[in-house]
Amino acid sequence: MTSTWRTRLAGVLAWTIALALFFPIAWAALTAFKTEQDAYTPTLLFTPTLDSFREVLERAHYPSFLGNSLAVSAISTLLALAIAIPAGYAMAFFPNRRTQQVLLWMLSTKMMPAVGVLLPVYLLAKTAWLLDSITALVIVYTLANLPIAVWMVFTYCNDVPREIFEAARMDGANLWQELVYVLLPTMLPGLASTALLLLILSWNEAFWSLNLTSIDAAPLTVFIASYSNPEGLFWAKLSAASVLAIAPILVLGWLAQRQLVRGLTFGAVK
């Protein structure tokens, strides 16, 4: 009986947490179909309208904001993976007494508030003439996501059976061939989940984009923030813009859900 009640309590707790996390998204989706008047004085009884979506999509430079988000997120994700894969491979298969210290130091950088390094990063970007450029965002996003990427790749590398590499060496494979032809195919599900996580982090990032860009390189997060200005807070349009920004990630996650689940459980059962 005790075990049954624990199971039920865990189920209720899980559903409560899930609903609490889903509620803001559901509320934003609901608000997106309201007029500004209905959104400002929240009501559940309203006539749905697509006016907010229409105004957001027809707003000047929207395709540019969308293109910037796609470019910055994709490029920074690929760069972070390109650096993290050999780094994680080297730390997992050729560790030394400082490997764990390096990993902990990299992880500790994620605990530093971004505002603490805003001024030096801004001055560096200004000196290098990179303000309001995609290059600046790509560099910052790549460096910001690199610790997570290295940690995840390092973990996946440790979960790969060493016997596979011993067999490859017996067949005459060198280090490069082990990495490309043995390790990468084996940990592909893990890399897929890592790539999706990095893409989501880059897509959702707002702090650096708001401080390092204005118009030319501004992503969708800046576009969404523009609906909160001195003239007021336009809840319906802000919600519509947020829903449109969330949609690509939801679709991508749905399409890659099989790889994502396999990646999250990679190495759980050997």
List PLM regions with ranges:
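A hydrophobic, multi-pass inner-membrane permease signature
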Residues: 1-270
